[in-house]
């Protein structure tokens, strides 16, 4: 996708002169760190069912597929996931003094703070759910913990304003007794690789909701997928290749395509007011 965008739009003239200089290479991650080190419980579970050394050959993971509906395997996996969630809950309690329910769904938006990565969209989603619960306490039946982890560039004022908004939503939601046992918001402070190794294995839902056409690849989507989180995302970056690999039934895709977004920008056809008026909520 993004190789085509470079060739046909951004560097169209250069590509026509030097086509041999353009080569698309997708980002990648190492399962040695993001599985074997970060999620040792899952790593040891996988080793029980895989013949061979998965540290040397990641393709051996495909040997797990026959066990996807195996009750014993699923029970063991559920235990691993719960232990990881308890580990994260202990970490956030020690570092930030926030009590997190490990039995809740961990809905995680974890990446660099940028407008195109759309942490703001997730904020609006949380506010929408909050208002729904205020009107109808039975709207949420399974508790959800919305987790943000991000840093903004030093000079990126709007990104810092979004972080400020997240903190305001966190305070509003967490201090409202009507939200007890329903939803909670957590902003993870001082996010870094070491914290990611605790958070990513605990995630139930992976938010990969960048504006289609803006994310060159991304690696967080791969890390979360490797650790068993369900991906909600747009057809952008590596989400496209993940969807092709796991099948559309195993990833939750929404939103317009990169081409659709480009056309809206070019022809000035995007009107959020119309969407708002037709979906009063």
Question: How does the language model describe each region?
Answer:
Residues 1-12, 272-281:
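Extended catalytic-interface subdomain
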Residues 2-6, 30-34, 115-116, 122-123, ...:
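Flexible loop/turn segments at secondary-structure boundaries
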Residues 18, 26-64, 201-202, 209-281:
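Catalytic binding pocket for nucleotide-activated donors in carbohydrate/polymer assembly enzymes
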């Amino acid at each position: 996708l993004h190789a085509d965008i470079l060739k046909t739009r951004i560097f169209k003239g250069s590509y026509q002169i030097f086509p041999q200089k353009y080569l698309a290479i997708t980002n990648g991650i190492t399962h040695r760190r993001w599985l074997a080190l970060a999620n040792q419980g899952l790593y040891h579970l996988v080793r029980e069912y895989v013949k061979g050394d998965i540290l040397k050959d990641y393709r051996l993971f495909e040997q797990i597929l026959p066990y996807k509906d195996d009750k014993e395997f699923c029970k063991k996996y559920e235990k691993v996931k719960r232990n990881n969630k308890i580990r994260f809950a202990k970490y956030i309690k020690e570092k930030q003094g926030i009590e997190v329910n490990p039995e809740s769904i961990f809905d995680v938006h974890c990446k660099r703070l940028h407008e195109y990565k759309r942490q703001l969209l997730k904020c609006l989603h949380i506010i929408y759910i909050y208002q729904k619960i205020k009107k109808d306490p039975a709207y949420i039946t399974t508790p959800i913990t919305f987790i943000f982890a991000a840093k903004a560039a030093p000079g990126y004022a709007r990104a810092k304003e979004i972080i400020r908004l997240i903190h305001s939503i966190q305070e509003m939601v967490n201090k409202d007794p009507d939200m007890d046992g329903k939803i909670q918001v957590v902003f993870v402070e001082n996010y870094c690789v070491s914290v990611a190794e605790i958070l990513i294995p605990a995630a139930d839902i992976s938010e990969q909701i960048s504006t289609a056409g803006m994310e060159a690849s991304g690696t967080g989507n791969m890390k979360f997928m490797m650790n068993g989180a369900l991906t909600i995302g747009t057809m952008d970056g590596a989400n496209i290749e993940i969807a092709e690999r796991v099948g559309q039934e195993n990833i939750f895709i929404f939103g317009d395509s990169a081409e659709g977004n480009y056309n809206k920008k070019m022809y000035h056809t995007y009107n959020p007011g119309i969407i708002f008026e037709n979906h009063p909520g």
